[in-house]
Amino acid sequence: PDSGLIEEFIEDYPYSPFPQMQYTERPDRFCAGLSEGLVGIIVDGSPMALLAPGNLASFFQSPEDYYERFPYGGPLRALRYVAGVIALVFPALYVAISLFHQEMLPTKLALAIAGSHVPVPFPVLVEALLMEVALELIRESSVRLPDPVGQTMGFVGALLLGDAAVSAGLVSPIMVIVVAVTGLASFTIPHYPTGLAIRLLRFLLLFSSAWLGLFGLMAGLMAIALHLGALTSFGVPYLEPLMKPRPSLRDVVWRSPVFTFNKRPEYPEPLDQVRQKKFIRTWAPGVAEMARKESGEGGGGDGEDGEDRGKSGDGAR
């Protein structure tokens, strides 16, 4: 049996489009999850391992965030969240504005969009569906081919298909740009099942936007938010790291420096909350003297660490 079969048997909400467990084939990510207090599941004969419980924030994290310095890893992770919103909302937002809310656009942009739709015989919704389905076909066909051929086939096929569709007057150039940006944004999501969920919900938002405009789009987003708020993974709320202001938030949307990760995340409820001691740069000018003064006045840093270690020891006992 594969780990995906085990996941369907033990997850809390099997009918939800959102995954509730992390799955990975990278040893570094698996070991990092174990060190944070997560439970790892390895199936004999399967290259994929499971980590539980899962939450929405963990699906936007990549091991490369920690291998780069935090001035680079932090913005890249924040960019992934922005790309996830674009991949979910951008086509539906374009359809809603084009059909119902043209007054929101500048005059020149509104005239350009209206002029690009003149030779197209289909409504905006049909245009978006045609391009989205074509993009999904190219993506699935490239996955089934060998890696070098599949990547080349994906890029070349998308370029040729978009150019041919515009030349034939089946879609507008602006729609090709919207779908292309959406496809690029969806590729930035590191967790594949989360990307699949966003791709599925994008079609639902397209229909709601074509029906009620921005009101339909907001209703769809509110339904998704309510669903995410009701989800749990082994009893842990799906939005747990984002619901409460905790110290672990420094590693959710933005990756802070590694030397500030003194505590483990709270939601797995690990027995030992202390991940590492408070880091002091004793070799830096003036820092060693300041640390000695603090320790002489009452051992602020050591006392705090000792208290944390005592609490963690009591929890373990």
Q: Which stretches of residues belong to each language-model region?
A:
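Active-site proximal loops enriched in glycine and acidic residues that flank catalytic Cys/His/Asp
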Residues: 43-45, 124, 147-149, 170, ...
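Transmembrane alpha-helical segments that form the functional core of multipass membrane systems
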Residues: 55-205
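Generic detector of intrinsically disordered, low-complexity, polar/charged segments
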Residues: 147, 159, 166, 210, ...
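Cytosolic regulatory modules rich in charged/polar residues
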Residues: 1-127, 233-252, 257-260, 270-281, ...
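Hydrophobic alpha-helical transmembrane segments of membrane transport and translocation systems
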Residues: 175, 180-298
